[in-house]
């Protein structure tokens, strides 16, 4: 037994010892563990014990584990690392993880916490305990005690194994709008490959007959990643991602569903039951409420993984969205989704965090730099922001109604809204495939039925006075407005919303950097320009504004928050900015217009005419 434990410990050291050789983006807490100075310090008087050993006995997919530990030489910088899979065997490491010299790497810790977190007297007593939340991630777990802090860790002891009763169970369903207005998609994750079970959804109108619909299955392998850490230290098997298409839905109706798998012996494994409300018919005159934000990320409710506080506010945003869920019809998370940055275990933790939201209302995404950017991968920008993911996890974990899911631009109709979602990680300039899509999306909407035309993108293509855009001198992505403002103006886009800059900012209705209205809160059409919003305060660390506040910048807030658009009817729209800390409205405006206002000419918004015409 002891020889086996020592072998595991030695291999854990190998795992950690290689992490320093691959640098991830500084935003990822796990990348802060500088373990290149690690030493082996197994101590017979030290121990780590975890209980219960079997989780999810009542069907739950997250559970608190009590971790008790003791060290004969305690220190304030001792910490507990959580590992999954629990065993670390160097013989299982893939070939492309060979290091110049031993040790070799298998996988990174899932999360960590300091040993004195719940016991300030840890250095006196040498004992402590933590309650750590684990989620079902398709494998078992173990817990390791380290001394020496994050910068000079010494492995002291490792625990028994802990596992969920059914690690393959279907978990974390997430809804998305389909390509047709009467279609809803449901995506979930499991450990069941097609060789083990067939994925199915049981669904129907609430209180009515239910039917079974099949689901497609996707996954991806390590060699689908573009670089480290996603391809090396951060790699973790994503399991299987299943998507079913629920079609011919009645408008504005409540449906119930559950996801599951039919095993080879005919037995069915089911999730718990969920419900959603289907979309209204395009143009249907009913109150419709949509939430929009970017750059949220994830955080641990047990306080772990806190090398920094970069995304702690994401829990506040999530909490407020859940609190207001009954008054929300759809959510758009416009890029920088979970900041996994190549540590793939974080994707499971993110979809678990948003499950109460995404299982109830459509959770639509846009592509951000932290999902897509990687050198020589076809992204519009160069950089290491995705940690080697190059878009693959995001494009697989979440369904979007795009023609090509590797090019995350698409249109979505919800009642009186038309959303045109751009992909700023691919070229959007005039003459490109995406530019043609954007124009088609804006031009093809019937504004008599869907008067509210909203443009969404991750990077700021319009206006922002965030310091890094001010330093560019463009107050936006270079080439952003240059290519697109004539489309916004021509097709009378009401509001354009972006993330990327981690703050909140609202402009006046603006065209070519000039305000086209001096009103600030109650707009009456025609606006003769587009209102631009930065909503990048979903939860990731905030970004400062420049000292200069341009004339077009009406409202700036250095805080976390999200937007809510309410289409009251075809003539009235309410815009609200709510803070994540309290859920209260801190900025708002209304737009009132009639169909004739959309038809009327404004500067550069009508076809050219001649004397002959």
Swiss-Prot record:
Highest taxon, organism lineage: Eukaryota
Residues the entry annotates as binding Zn(2+): 336, 369, 458, 500
The keyword Iron is annotated on this UniProt entry: yes
Entry keyword Acyltransferase: no
Cofactor note: Binds 1 Fe cation per subunit. Binds 1 zinc ion per subunit.
Any GO CC annotation of this UniProt entry: extracellular region
One Pfam family from the record: Pur_ac_phosph_N
Swiss-Prot/TrEMBL keywords: Glycoprotein, Iron, Metal-binding, Secreted, Signal, Zinc
Cited SUPFAM superfamilies: Metallo-dependent phosphatases, Purple acid phosphatase, N-terminal domain
Residues listed as glycosylation sites in the UniProt record: 89, 116, 316, 528, 551
Cell location: Secreted
Amino-acid positions noted as binding Fe cation in the UniProt annotation, renumbered to this chain: 295, 336, 339, 502
Name under which the protein is recorded: Probable inactive purple acid phosphatase 1
């Amino acid at each position: 037994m002891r020889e086996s434990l020592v072998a595991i410990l030695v291999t854990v050291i190998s795992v950690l010892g290689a992490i320093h050789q691959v640098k991830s983006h500084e935003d990822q807490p796990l990348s802060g563990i500088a373990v290149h100075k690690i030493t082996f310090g197994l101590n017979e008087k030290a121990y780590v014990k975890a209980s219960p050993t079997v989780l999810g006995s009542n069907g739950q997919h997250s559970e608190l584990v009590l971790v008790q530990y003791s060290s004969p030489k305690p220190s304030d910088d001792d910490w507990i690392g959580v590992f999954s899979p629990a065993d670390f065997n160097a013989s299982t490491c893939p070939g492309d993880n060979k290091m110049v010299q031993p040790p070799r790497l298998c996988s990174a810790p899932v999360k960590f916490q300091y040993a004195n977190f719940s016991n300030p007297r840890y250095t006196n007593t040498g004992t402590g305990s933590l309650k750590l939340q684990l989620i079902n991630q398709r494998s078992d777990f173990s817990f390791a005690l380290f001394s020496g802090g994050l910068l000079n860790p010494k492995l002291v002891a490792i625990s028994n194994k802990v596992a969920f009763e059914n690690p393959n169970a279907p978990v974390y369903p997430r809804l998305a709008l389909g390509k047709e207005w009467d279609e809803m998609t449901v995506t979930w994750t499991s450990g069941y490959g097609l060789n083990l079970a067939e994925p199915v959804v049981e669904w129907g109108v609430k209180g009515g007959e239910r039917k079974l619909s099949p689901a497609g299955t996707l996954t991806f392998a390590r060699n689908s990643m573009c670089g480290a850490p996603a391809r090396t230290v951060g790699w973790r098997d994503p399991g299987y991602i299943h998507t079913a298409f629920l079609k011919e839905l009645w408008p504005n109706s409540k449906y119930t569903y559950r996801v599951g798998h039919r095993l080879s012996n005919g037995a069915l494994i089911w999730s718990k039951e969920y419900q959603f409300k289907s979309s209204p018919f395009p143009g249907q005159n009913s109150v419709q409420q949509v939430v929009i934000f970017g750059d949220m990320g994830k955080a641990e409710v047990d306080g772990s993984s806190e090398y920094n506080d970069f995304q702690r506010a994401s829990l506040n945003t999530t909490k407020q969205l859940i609190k207001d869920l009954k008054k929300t019809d759809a959510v758009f998370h416009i890029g920088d989704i979970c900041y996994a940055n190549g540590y793939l275990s974080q994707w499971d933790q993110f979809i678990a965090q948003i499950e109460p939201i995404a299982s109830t209302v459509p959770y639509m995404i846009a592509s951000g730099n932290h999902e897509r950017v990687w050198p020589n991968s076809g992204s519009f920008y160069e950089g290491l922001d995705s940690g080697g993911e190059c878009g693959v996890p995001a494009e697989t974990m979440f369904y979007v109604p795009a023609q090509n899911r590797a090019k995350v631009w698409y249109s979505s109709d919800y009642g009186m809204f038309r959303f045109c979602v751009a992909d700023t990680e691919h070229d959007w300039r005039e003459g490109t495939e995406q530019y043609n899509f954007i124009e088609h999306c804006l031009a093809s909407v019937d504004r008599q039925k869907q008067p509210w035309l909203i443009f969404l993108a991750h990077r700021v293509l319009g206006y922002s006075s965030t310091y890094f855009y001010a330093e560019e001198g463009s107050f936006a992505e270079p080439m952003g407005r240059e290519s697109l403002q004539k489309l916004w103006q021509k097709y009378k886009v009401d509001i354009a919303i972006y993330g990327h800059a981690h703050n909140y900012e609202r402009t006046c209705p603006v065209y070519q950097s000039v305000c086209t209205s001096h009103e600030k809160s109650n707009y009456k059409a025609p606006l003769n320009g587009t209102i631009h919003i930065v909503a990048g305060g979903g939860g990731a660390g905030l970004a400062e504004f420049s000292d200069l506040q341009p004339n077009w910048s009406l409202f700036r807030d250095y805080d976390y928050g999200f937007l809510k658009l309410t289409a009251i009817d075809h003539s009235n729209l309410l815009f609200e900015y709510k803070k994540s800390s309290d859920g209260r409205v801190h900025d708002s405006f209304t737009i009132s217009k009639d169909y004739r206002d959309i038809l009327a000419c404004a500067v550069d918004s009508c076809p050219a005419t001649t004397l002959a015409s």
